[in-house]
Amino acid sequence: MAIVTLAELLEAGVHFGHQARRWNPKMFPYIYTERNGIHIIDLVQTSQLLTEACEFVKQASSDGRKVLFLGTKRQAAGIIAQEAQRCDSYYVNQRWLGGMLTNWVTIKSRVTRLRQLEEQDSSGLIDQLPKKEAAVLRRELDKLRKHLNGIKNMTRLPDIVVVVDQKRETTAIQECLKLGIPTICILDTNCSPEIINIPIPANDDAIRSIKLIIGKIADAIYEGKYGQMEPTELISSAEDK
């Protein structure tokens, strides 16, 4: 059973692709038509593939596997943080640091440093230092939080990565390919479905489109971890969208 209706997808503007001249021919199977020079995405396939993605992450989460959400573009950053936190998952919504996955040992040491500085900050230890030393540590803390806050509790590589904007997050996707980490990605008409495990053809620029799709995936992860969402949680989730 589909977890989203075609009406919901239409209302969120999921069907609007890029200008036809900017397309990637590999996306042809997911394009319904062209209208006024804009490619229109086949929402039947969007619904089917989003349902497949949700079933996949729900089962994976039920089995204890961990999901990382990735989206650093302005339209996605806030949604990525909100939805990942809601389903108790990891996220990166600022700049992707090269080697975040393939050089995890080094990144993990920076995550450990972030936690140490946060402990020192919360205990008041930094406040007891001379002003210059305290200022240096606070600058370091702010920088680490900016890039690593969404993965500060991540102790190992994620089992699945959910991506918004393939073109922007190429480095991260290549790292996933190298490590054999499955990817789910919102793919606009200028992307390539060949390097993604579960492509979700959709508008990756519109906030409502991103929020609808990422929200559905977060719902599925939540249900996989904790069981069916309570009615109050479902209402809150719908209002957020």
UniProtKB/Swiss-Prot annotation:
It comes from the Eukaryota. InterPro entries: Ribosomal_uS2, Ribosomal_uS2_bac/mit/plastid, Ribosomal_uS2_CS, Ribosomal_uS2_flav_dom_sf. Its main location: plastid. SUPFAM superfamilies: Ribosomal protein S2. Pfam families: Ribosomal_S2. It is found in: Plastid, Chloroplast. One of its GO terms (cellular component) is chloroplast. GO terms for molecular function: structural constituent of ribosome. GO terms for biological process: translation. CDD domains: RPS2. Keywords: Chloroplast, Plastid, Ribonucleoprotein, Ribosomal protein. Belongs to the universal ribosomal protein uS2 family. This is Small ribosomal subunit protein uS2c. It comes from Porphyra purpurea (Red seaweed).
